[in-house]
Amino acid sequence: MELVMKDAECALTVSETTFGRDFNEALVHQVVVAYAAGARQGTRAQKSRAEVKASRKKPWRQKGTGRARAGSVKSPIWRSGGITFAAKPQDHSQKVNKKMYQGALKSILSELVRQNRLIVVETFSVEKPKTKLLIQKLKEMSLRDVLIVTEEVDENLFLAARNLYKVDVRDAAGIDPVSLISFDKVVMTGNAVKQLEEMLA
């Protein structure tokens, strides 16, 4: 199959297994959930009644005071007491096979092509690290919410884009399923497309 280049009067021949496969929603969902789970810190920690540092003495005698029974100031129903089911640090990561991850990326790329959300260009750069220059370039292409994927991240382009809302710059090796589905359009250079194809072959 062929992808038409927007800034050149030619087409780029690409593999149908990478850019023309059916959309596997279940697989994409599983990989995206696993990716998001892997990004969680999982460092939250609370103290149970056994871990709270406090007196072990019974606050008042069992009978005769007219007050409710109390055996410990560490009780979860007391202020400053322990947490009943205290959260502990845990690893939230989920196992995703390489084949599944690549399959999800191929599904997303193919769906972007079908929805005309993937724009292939020969090159994409700015002369200086100026946000104004990038805004002008994006306006000319009628783009606002966009992920720019190049073979290697150009420093000028990265600096120009980092202060823009809903604009991100990645190299082909650094893209992930969440980034691809988070933007309205994806602009990709021809070399980045070829590099992606080799990675997912």
From Swiss-Prot:
Region (Disordered): 44-73
Database matches in InterPro entries: Ribosomal_uL4, Ribosomal_uL4-like, Ribosomal_uL4_dom_sf
The entry's keywords: Ribonucleoprotein, Ribosomal protein, RNA-binding, rRNA-binding
Biased composition (Basic residues): 55-66
Pfam families xrefs: Ribosomal_L4
GO biological process entries: translation
One Gene Ontology term, aspect cellular component: ribonucleoprotein complex
Domain of life: Bacteria
MF annotations from Gene Ontology: rRNA binding; structural constituent of ribosome
Role noted for this protein: One of the primary rRNA binding proteins, this protein initially binds near the 5'-end of the 23S rRNA. It is important during the early stages of 50S assembly. It makes multiple contacts with different domains of the 23S rRNA in the assembled 50S subunit and ribosome.
PANTHER family reported for this sequence: 50S RIBOSOMAL PROTEIN L4, LARGE RIBOSOMAL SUBUNIT PROTEIN UL4M
Subunit comment: Part of the 50S ribosomal subunit.
HAMAP family on file: Ribosomal_uL4_B (MF_01328_B)
Similarity remark: Belongs to the universal ribosomal protein uL4 family.
NCBIfam families registered for this protein in UniProt: rplD_bact
UniProt-recorded name of the protein: Large ribosomal subunit protein uL4
Organism this protein belongs to: Hamiltonella defensa subsp. Acyrthosiphon pisum (strain 5AT)
